[in-house]
Amino acid sequence: MSMPFYVSPEQLMKDRADFARKGIARGRSVAAVQYADGILFVSENPSQALHKVSEIYDRIAFAAVGRYNEFENLRIAGVRLADMRGYAYDRRDVTGRGLANAYAQTLGTIFSSGGEKPYEVELFVAEIGDEAAGDQLYRLTYDGQVADEHGFAVMGGAADTVASYLKERYAEGASLTDAVRLAVASLGHTDTEDRVIPADDLEVAVLDRTRSQPRKFARLRPARLEELLGERGPAQHAPEEPADPEPEPPIAPPG
């Protein structure tokens, strides 16, 4: 009689974490940068249909990396939660912190459950205040951990390299032009070269407190980006993202 197969809880959690991290790292980075008038989101995303950055509510935005179908489900759930809370109580009761806590609970439950695979996603939830001191930026990992970020944050892809570039050059209270140029340059930076990303390959959005409308979220189109970025030299598209690896075939037990 063969012994039952046993995996320790520690090893199981480690394997699930490694699985999620590998899936997230295969995508391209998203950078969030606080500037004088709000919060900027920049991602290299050639797709015009599939967005990594979206509006959740009046002053709240959502950004994600990883598997699109998984973070799109989370985005839709966040929009519904915000709408229901704003309708049942008051629009001011819808906060970025409350939404981040809801996402953390969902991601943590999925990660610790043995019934399904962990989500291969990381999220930003951002909210702007009437002044820069009231801005909030939360980063959520695949296992439901929440970090309160300040100044800038990066997730997905070569996040460490991009974050190091931003750390060396970031300054508080920058203009939108300076923030866009810094964020785009950081996404094109690697340890071996600096690449000029075409404006058409960029997804850029802001939470802008100076907008007169109650909804502070706005996307920056390629024409506006070209104006902000100025002359940068010849652009170069990114190499194709690696496809998901094929699963290894099972190994037959010895006869």
Swiss-Prot record:
BP terms from Gene Ontology: modification-dependent protein catabolic process; proteasomal protein catabolic process
Q: In which pathway does it act?
A: Protein degradation; proteasomal Pup-dependent pathway
Q: Where in the cell is it found?
A: Cytoplasm
What are the start and end residues of every segment in region (Disordered)?
A: 224-255
Q: Which GO terms describe its cellular component?
A: cytoplasm; proteasome core complex, alpha-subunit complex
Superkingdom, taxonomy of origin: Bacteria
Alphabetic keyword roster = Cytoplasm, Proteasome
Q: Which Gene3D superfamilies match?
A: Glutamine Phosphoribosylpyrophosphate, subunit 1, domain 1
Which Gene Ontology MF annotations are present? Answer: threonine-type endopeptidase activity
Q: Which Pfam families match?
A: Proteasome
- Regulation affecting activity: The formation of the proteasomal ATPase ARC-20S proteasome complex, likely via the docking of the C-termini of ARC into the intersubunit pockets in the alpha-rings, may trigger opening of the gate for substrate entry. Interconversion between the open-gate and close-gate conformations leads to a dynamic regulation of the 20S proteasome proteolysis activity.
Q: Which InterPro entries match?
A: Ntn_hydrolases_N, Proteasome_alpha, Proteasome_alpha-type, Proteasome_asu_bac, Proteasome_sua/b
Q: What does this protein do?
A: Component of the proteasome core, a large protease complex with broad specificity involved in protein degradation.
Share what the entry says about its subunit structure, partners included: The 20S proteasome core is composed of 14 alpha and 14 beta subunits that assemble into four stacked heptameric rings, resulting in a barrel-shaped structure. The two inner rings, each composed of seven catalytic beta subunits, are sandwiched by two outer rings, each composed of seven alpha subunits. The catalytic chamber with the active sites is on the inside of the barrel. Has a gated structure, the ends of the cylinder being occluded by the N-termini of the alpha-subunits. Is capped by the proteasome-associated ATPase, ARC.
Q: Which PANTHER family match?
A: PROTEASOME SUBUNIT ALPHA/BETA
The entry's family comment says:
Belongs to the peptidase T1A family.
The name of this protein is: Proteasome subunit alpha
Organism of provenance: Nocardioides sp. (strain ATCC BAA-499 / JS614)
